[in-house]
């Protein structure tokens, strides 16, 4: 015979935070006790040791995703393609009694409503949209976005406000379960709820990232949403000024394991007059002094002959230790005009501009060492920048990059490292894939503690 107290002790053994809830209900429910008379009369028997069974249940439950999906997207199943075209199959788990065929032109907006009772499904046969949705029953729910592509079905839960921004000419089927009156808005089907205007539509269409910047795949899955946020370092000049708000969401590429933001805000808007100067941090200054001494020793660099470039050089913090070691041939590349001016004032030669193919001809080549600290998080045009770095390198040269490590972000829950300047979030796996595409090889990796 097993009592509730017995079960509680076993549960607490594997999960010390568990609590027991006492009820007076005679009918078994979600918190029924194993000593309940009605259950015992049914002759319930444990086929396995209770201790092991509870341990297994707690272990499995701990790994279950408890996130509430307000709206989700799926592709077709059991697809078949030949020279005639492609067949995709979609399973509908509930009856459909009406189908609407809808065409929408690029740049238009639909929905801006919610369904109080019914679940809505939309099957997209052509085009592409950005969906924006929000749980209206939860006052703290963030506004979330996702992309729906041709050949995918989107399911919208009841009481979820949603809007469609059409990024291409689009055709879709609206699969309706239940009653739908002739007028679009009615108590039994749809209630108007405008929460996306034309300004937000234009903002999304101008900066949304539809494909992986590492491999080009469109199979991106949203893994984190922090709602709409202002740009972190663009401070207001006046108290009553208003900031533009952008989605702050991380998408995961199922093809190459790259993680990136759902939007790519124009780099000139964020970096042309950058406020953060790296030299203000003693941790960074000390780190780059130690790094310079290490690189000189390991790579056998010569203060007279070696040529060193720092991409995204900020105020010259990583090059100053080389200057102090009497290296004559150093160059910073910095897009922020205020920082480039500051570095040049401090006698650290700095080119003001982005590292692009257009600017490549203005920069001396054959570098023995190219540094890039956190630049691979700050660049939307990753491949172009990386190709330029390889082009600037001497045949025996080395590129050393520093990036925030995704595994540490997950382990330490440092979500404050997620902001719009950081377009990308790297693991070693995704970095190896990225450089392999460029026929470059990562031959060494190590952790450094600079944050």
Residue ranges and their predicted role:
Residues 401-424, 428-430:
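Short, glycine-/aromatic-enriched active-site segment of Class I SAM-dependent methyltransferases
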Residues 136-158:
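Short acidic-glycine-tyrosine-enriched beta hairpin
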Residues 66-98, 109-111, 202-203:
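A short, N-terminal "cap"/entry segment at the start of jelly-roll beta-barrel domains
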């Amino acid at each position: 015979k097993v009592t509730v107290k017995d079960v509680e002790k076993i549960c607490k053994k594997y999960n010390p935070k568990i609590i027991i809830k006492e009820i007076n209900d005679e009918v078994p429910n979600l918190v029924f006790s194993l000593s309940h008379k009605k259950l015992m009369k049914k002759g319930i028997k444990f086929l396995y040791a209770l201790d092991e069974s509870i341990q297994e249940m707690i272990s499995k439950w701990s790994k279950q995703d408890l996130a509430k999906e307000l709206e989700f997207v799926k592709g077709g199943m059991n697809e078949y393609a030949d020279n005639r075209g492609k067949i995709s199959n979609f399973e509908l788990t509930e009856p459909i009694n009406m189908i609407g065929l809808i065409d929408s032109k690029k740049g238009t907006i639909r929905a801006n409503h919610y369904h109080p009772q019914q679940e809505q499904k939309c099957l997209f046969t052509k085009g592409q949209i950005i969906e924006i949705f929000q749980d209206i029953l939860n006052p703290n729910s963030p506004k979330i976005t996702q992309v729906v592509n041709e050949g995918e079905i989107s399911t919208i839960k009841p009481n979820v406000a949603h809007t469609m921004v059409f990024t291409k000419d689009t055709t879709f089927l609206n699969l309706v379960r239940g009653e739908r009156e002739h007028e679009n808005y009615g108590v039994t089907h749809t209630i108007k709820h405008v929460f996306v205007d034309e300004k937000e539509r234009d903002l999304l269409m101008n900066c949304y990232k539809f494909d992986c910047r590492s491999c080009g795949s469109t199979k991106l899955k949203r893994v984190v949403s922090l709602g709409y946020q202002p740009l972190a370092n663009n401070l207001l000049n006046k108290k009553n000024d208003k900031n533009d708000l952008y989605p702050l969401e991380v998408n995961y590429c199922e093809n190459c394991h790259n993680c990136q933001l759902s939007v790519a805000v124009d780099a000139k808007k964020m970096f042309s007059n950058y406020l953060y100067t790296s030299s203000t941090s003693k941790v960074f200054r000390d780190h780059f002094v130690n790094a310079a001494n290490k690189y000189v020793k390991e790579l056998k660099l010569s203060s007279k002959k070696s040529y060193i470039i720092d991409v995204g050089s900020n105020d010259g913090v990583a090059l100053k230790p080389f200057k102090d070691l009497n290296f004559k041939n150093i160059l910073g590349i910095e897009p922020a005009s205020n920082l480039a001016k500051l570095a040049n004032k401090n006698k650290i030669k700095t080119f003001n501009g982005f590292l692009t193919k257009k600017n490549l001809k203005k920069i001396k080549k054959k570098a023995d060492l190219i540094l890039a600290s956190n630049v691979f998080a700050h660049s939307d045009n990753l491949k172009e920048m990386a190709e330029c770095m390889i082009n600037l390198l001497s045949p025996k040269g080395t590129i050393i990059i520093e990036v925030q490590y995704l595994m540490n972000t997950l382990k330490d829950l440092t979500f404050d490292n997620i902001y719009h300047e950081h377009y990308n979030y790297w693991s070693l796996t995704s970095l190896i894939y990225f450089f392999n595409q460029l026929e470059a090889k990562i031959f060494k990796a190590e952790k450094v503690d600079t944050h």
